[in-house]
Amino acid sequence: AVIYYSSSTSWIPEYFMDLGASDTALFDIDNLTLANSQATYDSLMNYDVFFIKGGDQWDYYNTWKNTKVEDAITDKFNQGGVIMGTSAGMAILSKLIFTAENGSVYPDDAMTDENDPDITLADDFLNIFSEYIFDTHFVERGRLGRLIPFCLNTSLSTFNNSHFKNGLGVDDRTAICIDSNNIGEVMGSAAVTI
């Protein structure tokens, strides 16, 4: 299942079919009615793999939080399904997420103040990877300078009480596959920074 919020990318299902998928479907879930529909949940649960497209993580967070879509993603993960995403679709999979509620935050601004109001973090969404915060387009956009402040941010009480936060930055054309034992394998042409 290819899940997204905005305009369709019609080549993605064919791409997954070429890689060996037996079936694919596009789910354009861009409003609360669709996101909270039992029919949407039931349709999603017919698939073993969920791929969440890039876009804007605020749209995902704002539209899918506390809905049947969030339930489907979490339930499928707990049943052993594969949950993956690219760009914003990956960013929402960690316990601590940068919601981008006020748009992106640039590394130089984030480095100046780890509690900058544009660093909008949340810890009440999917929680697929509970001890991480993910960032993407990492080296290409110089995001080490914002991932460190994300990890140091003290605005969320659940992370104030945690003894560590792991920042994980993934470069373009690169993936990290994390198994149920929290072991990751990097694939692709660049790097993952932890």
Which role fits each region the language model picked out?
Residues 1-53:
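N-terminal beta1-alpha1 cap of cysteine-dependent amidohydrolase-like domains
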Residues 7-10, 15-20, 97-99, 103-194:
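C-terminal and late-domain segments of enzyme folds
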Residues 43, 66-80:
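Catalytic-core regions built around general acid/base machinery
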Residues 53-54, 77-97:
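Catalytic nucleophile loop
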Residues 57-67:
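Glycine/threonine-rich flexible loop motifs
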Residues 57-58, 90-93, 175-177:
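Short, active-site-adjacent cap segments at secondary-structure transitions
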Residues 22, 45-49, 79-82, 129, ...:
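Loop/turn elements at helix/coil->beta-strand transitions in domains of secreted/extracellular proteins
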Residues 47-48, 60, 84, 88-89:
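A substrate-binding/cap region within the structured catalytic cores of diverse enzymes
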